[in-house]
Amino acid sequence: MRRSFYASSTENTPMMMTQARVLSTGTTDNGTIRYDEVDETKRWFNRRFCFLTVIGIAVLLLAMVVIVVIVLLLTQLKAANSNAQNAMSSSKVQLEELTRKLSQPLEQLGPTLERLSNMPGFPMGPSPTTQTPPGVPPISPIVTGPNTTPESPRRSPKARYEWKGCQNLGKCELSGYTKPPLVILSLDGFAREYVDRNIVQTLNHIADCGVKADKVYPSYPSKTFPNHYSIVTGLWPESHGITDNSVFDPTISPVLESMKSTKYEKFFEGEPIWSVYKRKTGKKANCLFWVGCAYNNSGYAPDVAPAYNQELPFRNRIDTVVEWLKLPVDERPGLITAYLHEPDNAGHYQVDEEDVDEKLAEIDENLDYLMSRLSEEKLLECINFAILSDHGMQLIDKTYYFQDYLDLKGLITAKGVVGRVYINDTTISVNDVVDKFRCKIDTVKTNTRSDVPTRKHYSRDPRVGEVLLEGRAGVTFYKSKADDYELSGDHGYDYFNPKMHTIFYARGPSFKQNTTISPYQNIQYMNLWMNLLGIEGAVETNGTIGFFDNILTNPPRRDNPTNVIGECPMIAFPSVLKCSGNVSAETLNQLSVKLTNCAFSPTNIPLYSDNHCFQNYCDNSVIVSRKGNDARRAIIEVLSRDEASNPSNFTFLNAKYQSNCPSHIPTGSLTIRQNSQLSSMVDERIDVPNNFLLKVLDPLQAKSMEYLNKFGKMYVISGTATDINHDGIADSNGSVITHIYRIMLICNSTWLLMNPPLCTDSDSMDTLSFIFPITEQSTIDCMSSDDILLDYTATIFDVERISGFQFGIGALSQNQNTIIRRKISTKLW
């Protein structure tokens, strides 16, 4: 066994054999060690030890270097991590600030950033426990595969509404805003029913500090271009020329022109608000995509009106409006009209309601952004701001094609839920076209300009077409299958359809707080705009001045008219002048006594006119023209269910006003209670075609008696009118009767007075009015009696226009009378 060289000689000597000596030559002899041999060994050891020492020191130094490097790296990493966190935090703040301040919002960065913002850890997106600043849009993650994550509830708002609250209402902190600018923002196709989905909560917060409409009726037809132009002119489509989205007028163009792209300014009639404002004040008006802004038909175009660009994000549009409002006072527009094309587009192409709901959520976010920006810029309390819409939306489930029913040669057809036919060939008559449709298609009404209900105000202008088709809700018309857009939703229907109803919200220093106005039609807006801009009455409109007084903080004082209709000139003492029939002398004497007894009793007719007078028949009155040779009459009846019946078969006049009976006594009757002696007045008689008598007049009388029995008392005005050109306005020559009308008033509380009519609670007064064109043939042939009556309802204002007098109750305020006169009835009692 080999021993270690480090063993001592003393220890090892006894174990060595005597013969084993180390010779100087390197051999052993007898156990003796040679010293030269030992020195060599030491030298070898020393050399090896030094080498190992050097290696060890080197390894140690290397280890120390590694440790130092690791420590330095750890220190650097820690510092880098801290810097990174600070940088991320700083970037987040900067990006959030940029989002609020830059005129190019996040939407311009594209859908990718919008979707990334909500990804966990992404610096722009809100963390689960961190609120994002106002104005920053919530952004969804990009989904590259099937989305298995359930959506959040549709009605959970993403907006923050940090601007809401009324604590600073009317307190403008900026200088140069003594006259508040007016901003009108339209949300195309925002139906009244969308409000009830409770998604666009920004509107609720606006109403808390301002005003809202219960609902708004569009003008007929409820299409985008006609209604947007009605909103800024105060005129019905038949009066401002934009009768639909597409219009044919051979005096302007030989083809059906789209109002989206037409080059002809002549289509746009009437004077829009921006023109009136500039003309009357000399101040600036800017327009962002509103219908008509691109056409200078009056000589006063908007100062700024960019070309329409549907791709421009809503945030950019909002920022544009805000930047306009921030301009110096001499550059700032006093009027801004702005347009957003949603949710109309979503409604047209919706697969289900969720598609519209999603767009409503986006609208809420954008409106919240708008209000936040106005608040941040301290503009919110310095401007009058209105949000409104033009129409609603209806799902489509049935389509008819003109070519399936007509030879289209010589005809021009216009698509839509109101199908229109223009006759462009003089050899084709209106009846030729009408006969192809009238009562041929179930639930489709066929009208001509002569029998369109007056309330629609869609017959004055030939641009409406010669024949109009309108089906039930859900029906639409196209020229052919090839022309069918296959829309899932559309609009244009009669405003009776609740899905066509729309919205109005407003706030600002000129508006009351938390106030709701009763329903109205959008032609009323123009008078509101002129009032807010200080130019009230600058142009005539189809609306009524003062309609919005009850939502304004400082409405002007208004009085009722003073030209109450007076009594007709007396030519003799009251007595009965018999004209036809058989009657006893005793009966005539009793009736003469009755006329004498009431002849000088106070009579207050709730009508205003300089051109009419009344003839007193006690509980009845006859309204006639002061001009001679005028066949038009109006009969006022004060009716009670408990009045005794007294049938008669004669006719008479009151000799107090007339000395001669007419040569012809008509057989029809305008009075409701036809079993009384006073119903035998000659002036209440009328001749009408048999079909009209059966389909209109008889059902009207029966329904009126039904109402009298139901409500107990009624105040009724029935009359005849002349409107040969179908413009809804009384003709100057009244020799030919073309229409009949009726106004019925009841009290849902109790009557304070019957003559003139007055309820103990003025808000409980209800009215129902009708105007019927007198025709032998019309679409009524295929309608039920109630459908006919409802279709031909009208406002009192409509009756005023076609009769020539104005209605008003002296005991009511001008605004109360205005609300009654403009009330639209969408159902029978």
Swiss-Prot record:
Q: State the SUPFAM superfamilies in the record.
A: Alkaline phosphatase-like
Instruction: Report any Pfam family annotated for this entry.
Output: Phosphodiest
Which keywords describe this protein according to UniProt?
Answer: Disulfide bond, Glycoprotein, Hydrolase, Membrane, Signal-anchor, Transmembrane, Transmembrane helix
Main location, first listed in the record: membrane
* Any single GO CC term annotated in Swiss-Prot or TrEMBL for this entry: membrane
Q: Which residues are glycosylated?
A: N296, N424, N514, N542, N582, N649, N733, N748
Task: List cystine links.
Answer: C439-C782
Active site per database record: T224 (nucleophile)
Enzyme class, one word?
hydrolase
Residues crossing the lipid bilayer are: 54-74
Compartments, record wording: Membrane
| GO MF annotations in UniProt | hydrolase activity
Q: Might you give the EC number(s) for this enzyme?
A: 3.1.-.-
Membrane topology annotation: Single-pass type II membrane protein
InterPro entries named among the record's database cross-references? Alkaline_phosphatase_core_sf, DNA/RNA_non-sp_Endonuclease_sf, Phosphodiest/P_Trfase
Q: Give the family from UniProt.
A: Belongs to the nucleotide pyrophosphatase/phosphodiesterase family.
* General function of this protein: Probable phosphodiesterase.
Protein name per the record: Ectonucleotide pyrophosphatase/phosphodiesterase C27A7.1
To which species is this protein native? Caenorhabditis elegans
